[in-house]
Curated annotation (Swiss-Prot):
This is Non-structural protein V. The keyword Isomerase does not apply. Zn(2+) 2 binds at C429, C441, C443, C446. One of its GO terms (biological process) is symbiont-mediated suppression of host JAK-STAT cascade via inhibition of STAT1 activity. Interacts with host IFIH1/MDA5, DHX58/LGP2, STAT1 and STAT2. Keywords: Host cytoplasm, Host-virus interaction, Inhibition of host innate immune response by virus, Inhibition of host interferon signaling pathway by virus, Inhibition of host MDA5 by virus, Inhibition of host RLR pathway by virus, Inhibition of host STAT1 by virus, Inhibition of host STAT2 by virus, Interferon antiviral system evasion, Metal-binding, Phosphoprotein, Viral immunoevasion, Zinc. Belongs to the paramyxoviruses V protein family. The P/V/C gene has two overlapping open reading frames. One encodes the P/V/W proteins and the other the C protein. Residues 28-37, 77-96 have a biased composition (Polar residues). It comes from Hendra virus (isolate Horse/Autralia/Hendra/1994). Plays an essential role in the inhibition of host immune response. Prevents the establishment of cellular antiviral state by blocking interferon-alpha/beta (IFN-alpha/beta) production and signaling pathway. Interacts with host IFIH1/MDA5 and DHX58/LGP2 to inhibit the transduction pathway involved in the activation of IFN-beta promoter, thus protecting the virus against cell antiviral state. Blocks the type I interferon signaling pathway by interacting with host STAT1 and STAT2 and thereby inhibiting their phosphorylation and subsequent nuclear translocation. Coiled coil: none annotated.
Amino acid sequence: MDKLDLVNDGLDIIDFIQKNQKEIQKTYGRSSIQQPSTKDRTRAWEDFLQSTSGEHEQAEGGMPKNDGGTEGRNVEDLSSVTSSDGTIGQRVSNTRAWAEDPDDIQLDPMVTDVVYHDHGGECTGHGPSSSPERGWSYHMSGTHDGNVRAVPDTKVLPNAPKTTVPEEVREIDLIGLEDKFASAGLNPAAVPFVPKNQSTPTEEPPVIPEYYYGSGRRGDLSKSPPRGNVNLDSIKIYTSDDEDENQLEYEDEFAKSSSEVVIDTTPEDNDSINQEEVVGDPSDQGLEHPFPLGKFPEKEETPDVRRKDSLMQDSCKRGGVPKRLPMLSEEFECSGSDDPIIQELEREGSHPGGSLRLREPPQSSGNSRNQPDRQLKTGDAASPGGVQRPGTPMPKSRIMPIKKGHRREVSICWDGRRAWVEEWCNPVCSRITPQPRKQECYCGECPTECSQCCHEE
């Protein structure tokens, strides 16, 4: 069935619908003409393929079944000798080429055409390589060893020898190849799949700031972060073209900030560190306190207060000395008022007057320096000066035992051009937030102050 027949059938269907439009039952805008069932369409396709190819029988599973012999084949369609001297002539192919009729279906996976360029080198597009300039085309022969025979065009190459192939050999070769590919269902022109070599080592991932500080790192956590000095250039990220100008600008900005990041060091680095930076309890080192217990002088809070974390305290106990790295800023204090929620509470009067910064409370003994008080009033006496601090429960008249503490959180922030570390404290009952934000107590049992932050100074 060619294109003209298909077009005529379509026109006949349109005429039938137009003539019987009034008789067709209307079902809410949908046509009552139903499509044939899948079984009917499958049977119609089987009949079409059998009538077109004439050499395959459809099996029950839908796969073509080859008879394996030459009785059901039309030998004249496969090959024919047109010249009297025995040379190869033009053979009629049972394969429909896409170049001639792109709408037809290619029935066989094997192209068996050998075409002379009788019209001045115009190529029909058959074969794996066709070149009108050369005047000859390749032909995939039916030999079982996979040889390729090049049939020259005698008109373009008159001195080429004439090749004679017995008709029986050609029939056996073509039938053998067609049986082989038809039974296997393979495409001879397909390119074999070559998998990639998975054993080739890939490039190492780029260094990210989370690797050094242990926050936000996914994957293998068994490897400890590197100790000692950290290359700060690896976490400087500049997206502007003026890198030199931006670098000078942010170096000046970091120089103004005295907040520093504390990382762990090994005892071997102790010789190159000033002893004035040794942080720890004087009682642990055999020294006496410069002031009596409970009589600490009030210190004036300055912006260059140095915060230390548990990593620093652990390094002191192991014999290491903390080392400070400049040019990384911790911008949020433990109870800072930069959060918009806290500022809104202050405007509403929930936190009247008073400073939001933490002060060091009196200490009863040196051994209980890092331990929170187990009996605190959550009323006016819960905070120094009778000031209600953000993130604390509402005042109550009874004494409530403290069952929960605080959680120290660290976040590495990045504004597109630089990265810095922010650290803050939240009650244990509050949610863990990806951004630095002071959360309020939900259970009413958390302390009003973080004992770790209060006893650091």
